[in-house]
Amino acid sequence: MILSIMQPYLFPYIGYWQLIANSDKFIFFDVVQYNKKSWMNRNKILHPDKSKEFQYISFPVKNNLQGTLISAVTLNNEEKWKEKILGQLTVYKSLKAPYYNETIDLIQNIFIQDYQTLLSFSIESTKKICQYLDIELKYEIASEIDFDRKIIEGPGDWALSISKEFNTSEYINLYGGYKIFDETKY
């Protein structure tokens, strides 16, 4: 079995989808600390002012205190973040971006549901985008897996422990992550 593991992201980059497409099982990695400056609840899009390179889209979170696990991060639904994101994305309509209407339809389909947590949004949006892209998604959530946390001494050990739990024959990761892994342990 080929396994891959990633933290949840807001509309992730292409490498995320490549991992899912090339895995037999994908793990939503939610058992580490949330980082408010990460891509978990924000992303970059083009800015309507051509003199500016980009703008952020994001959804607000309620509890982003230092030490909060990703699995515990809740969304602040009192703010109208869905409407704001859809409004920000109109920059692509003005640029006559191909597939704009299809993409907005997909995002609106994702936004129909109410989400209480960052993780629930990430899972549901990933499922719907995979369906749109015709990518099979078989997933687990790290916080729901009974894997050996005692062997974890560094960042690369999480994947090793989860891989052992599933008797994985191969673990794949994006290129940028190779620095945290000790090949001799795999």
Please tell me what each predicted stretch does.
Residues M1-Y186:
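Residues lining hydrophobic/aromatic ligand-binding pockets adjacent to catalytic sites
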